[in-house]
From Swiss-Prot:
<keyword id="KW-0472">Membrane</keyword>
<dbReference type="Pfam" id="PF01333">
    <property type="entry name" value="Apocytochr_F_C"/>
</dbReference>
<dbReference type="InterPro" id="IPR002325">
    <property type="entry name" value="Cyt_f"/>
</dbReference>
<feature type="transmembrane region" description="Helical">
    <location>
        <begin position="287"/>
        <end position="306"/>
    </location>
</feature>
<keyword id="KW-0408">Iron</keyword>
<dbReference type="GO" id="GO:0015979">
    <property type="term" value="P:photosynthesis"/>
</dbReference>
<keyword id="KW-0249">Electron transport</keyword>
<feature type="binding site" description="axial binding residue">
    <location>
        <position position="38"/>
    </location>
    <ligand>
        <name>heme</name>
    </ligand>
</feature>
<keyword id="KW-1133">Transmembrane helix</keyword>
<feature type="binding site" description="covalent">
    <location>
        <position position="61"/>
    </location>
    <ligand>
        <name>heme</name>
    </ligand>
</feature>
<protein>
    <recommendedName>
        <fullName>Cytochrome f</fullName>
    </recommendedName>
</protein>
<dbReference type="InterPro" id="IPR024058">
    <property type="entry name" value="Cyt-f_TM"/>
</dbReference>
<dbReference type="GO" id="GO:0020037">
    <property type="term" value="F:heme binding"/>
</dbReference>
<keyword id="KW-0349">Heme</keyword>
<keyword id="KW-0934">Plastid</keyword>
<keyword id="KW-0812">Transmembrane</keyword>
<dbReference type="InterPro" id="IPR024094">
    <property type="entry name" value="Cyt_f_lg_dom"/>
</dbReference>
Amino acid sequence: MKIYRQIKQSFSITKIVFSFFISLLLNLVAQPTICQAFPIYAQQAYQIPREATGRIVCANCHLGKKPVEIEVPQAVLPNTVFEAVVKIPIDKGAQQIQANGQKGPLNVGAVLMLPEGFKLAPAERLSEELKAKTAGLYFQPYSADKENILVIGPIPGDKNQEIIFPILSPNPETNKNVKYLKYQLHVGGNRGRGQVSPTGEKTNNTIYNASVNGRISEITKLENGGYEITITTKNGESKIETIPAGPSLVVKKGQTIKADQPLTIDPNVGGFGQMDTEIVLQSAGRVQGLIAFFISVVLAQIFLVLKKKQFEKVQAAEMNF
């Protein structure tokens, strides 16, 4: 009986350990790594993704400049769903340097800063057409208390050069913090990996330069695919420059170089861009009043023409008399 209990206890411990490793493995597979989910950098480091100067903080890591566009309606009614279309064009066939040094397809991502009160439209408010346009896209608020700031990415760039955000406009009748006014929207969009990590270190998706003057005395290829370049100065001191896997060298052994001279090509094919636009939260009563005004103007013009014709007829009759 004692042996049976020991075997049973041993089996239970083995089962628990096995379950733990299975759970850990599933988490590693299911969750993206921090180098893949670049929006998390800004979310962790900045309370809001736009600085006082108007610069969106993504530009701190994505140093290349590329265009981005946004299209929204000129005006929207309260409590309605509309589309905000963010366009992030990429070069067809362009491939980026991945973290392991290999080339791969470009990813894209975007951050959309809406006015206070505007937010991501709930699924039950989407039309079938809008559901089809946003299928497979996962939008999330920048933080729990910033529902008006939305982020998405990384997602495949070849299939998502246009990202449609389904937005729900606020209702000033129920939200007293919102007024019928013209508001600004800010969008930032990037394609490809950054050149600087949040800690300030270079990634392998940027150019590497020499830090001193001297002569390249040795180039050693590392097991991980990178290089160690030994530069000997005039004083006989040796400076080792470490190049990660990815960037290709543009120098060779025996070459004399100067400080800040490129040691590698610039492998970055991506970049970041931002754009501002405006949208009007329009009152339905104002629209109805405007329509009524236009109708009254048209009717007044019609009556004026009829009155003029009537006057001309009377005047002609008097002249004939």
